[in-house]
Regions:
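Acidic/histidine-rich catalytic cores of soluble enzymes
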Residues: 1-91
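Intrinsically disordered, low-complexity regions of eukaryotic proteins
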Residues: 8, 81, 116-117, 126
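Alpha-helical elements of Rossmann-like donor-binding domains used by nucleotide-donor carbohydrate transfer enzymes
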Residues: 18-21, 57, 96, 100, ...
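Conserved hydrophobic residues forming the short capping helix/wall of the S-adenosyl-L-methionine
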Residues: 23-26, 101, 132
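A short, acidic, flexible beta-alpha connecting loop/helix-capping segment that sits on the rim
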Residues: 75, 111-121
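C-terminal helical cap(s) of enzyme catalytic domains, especially alpha/beta-barrels
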Residues: 118-132
Length: 132
């Protein structure tokens, strides 16, 4: 049986460092990571450069432990408040994130669309496919 943890910006395990600490502390071959790229991004690290540094850490520190990828759109209002967006309008650096994911040893990674809106399925699928 496998068990997976997920970094969530607004929770206790909210940075690559925190995920790495949990993985190192538990040290189980059955512990994996669900990688939701949006969950690593907050208003202070929403720039592409800051996100590329995050993706470098995720890939090098525990990329081989990633078992699935979540995909959702988000952005931040001027006051820093999180808001859901269409994938095309997201502040998430999906290009950089998927460049990192393509370097991992896993032959296949399931990608799960979160917060899906059926009316946008075609545009969501086209957007996601642009990274493969």
């Amino acid at each position: 049986m496998l068990f997976a943890v997920e970094c969530v910006y607004y929770h206790a395990m909210n940075t690559p460092e925190a995920v790495r600490m949990v993985l190192d502390t538990i040290a189980s071959p059955n512990l994996r990571v669900i990688c939701d790229l949006a969950n690593y991004v907050g208003p202070e690290n929403a720039s592409v450069d800051a996100q590329r540094r995050l993706w470098d850490k995720v890939g090098s520190w525990y990329g081989d432990k990633i078992a699935a990828v979540h995909f959702k759109g988000q952005s931040f209002k001027p006051d820093g408040t999180l808001c859901s967006t269409r994938l095309e309008d997201s502040c998430v650096d999906y290009r950089g994130g998927f460049e990192m994911l393509r370097t991992l040893p896993q032959p296949v990674l399931p990608v799960l669309r979160e917060e899906a809106v059926p009316a946008r399925a075609a545009s969501d699928l086209a957007f996601m496919k642009s990274f493969f």
